[in-house]
Amino acid sequence: MIGVGDTAPDFIAPAVSDGTADELALFRLVEAHDAVALLFAPATFVPTCTAELAAVRDAGWDERDDLAVAALTGDSLYAAFAYADRFDLPFSVVADFHGGVAESYDLLADSWEGHSEIPRRATVVIDCDWTVRFAETT
């Protein structure tokens, strides 16, 4: 797993942002904010992961000018649409369905619930100079 003090890898990946299909480019978030919180989850609609993302939503993390938030799941863009809409998520939901982003952060699960090459549950916080300031798997 990527650790505190490491340099975070950049990525561009398909995402749902404000109800629209988009590409999330990490470098844009890093340039525009003091910190970026990446919330990795193996799949959408997993009760534990949904509770975590709902807590972030309810805490208003996305309302801070100095912090960007993005969720990353191992599901398709279509699942990300349904998930973001169902739970009214105000931050981007990235579809890391091939596990490339998770792999670059050394967060790829060998297997989970019969699936492979999907993200493990984790939170990674990156500052504006690309340094990982917090990293934890759950």
Predicted regions and their residues:
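Chalcogenol-based redox active-site neighborhoods
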Residues: 1-138
